[in-house]
Amino acid sequence: MGLSFQHILILLVVVLLLFGRNKISDLMGDFAKGIKAFKKGMSDDEVETAKSDSIKTIDNTGKPTNVQANPQRQDSTV
């Protein structure tokens, strides 16, 4: 048993009576500002990611170096 059109209409009337028309419009305006701020933050993050990806390039034209991970130590005491 789900919500019918009559149930939804009654809920809307009760919400309008409880909050009033001005309060609901203020809430919807705040909700819209939140969505805009979220979208702006997501687009700013994508721009920063694109900038950081272009900066992190490695030029592999140098000579390779041989590095020994665990060099053996030579003890001078016998």
Curated annotation (Swiss-Prot):
Question: What is the superkingdom listed in this entry's lineage?
Answer: Bacteria
Name the InterPro entries on file. TatA/B/E, TatA/E
Please provide an example of a Pfam family that matches this protein in its UniProt record.
TatA_B_E
Ranges annotated as spanning the membrane? 4-21
Region annotated Disordered sits at: 49-78
Which molecular-function annotations from GO does this UniProt entry contain? Answer: protein transmembrane transporter activity
What is the protein named?
Sec-independent protein translocase protein TatA
Query: Which organism is the protein's source?
Result: Afipia carboxidovorans (strain ATCC 49405 / DSM 1227 / KCTC 32145 / OM5)
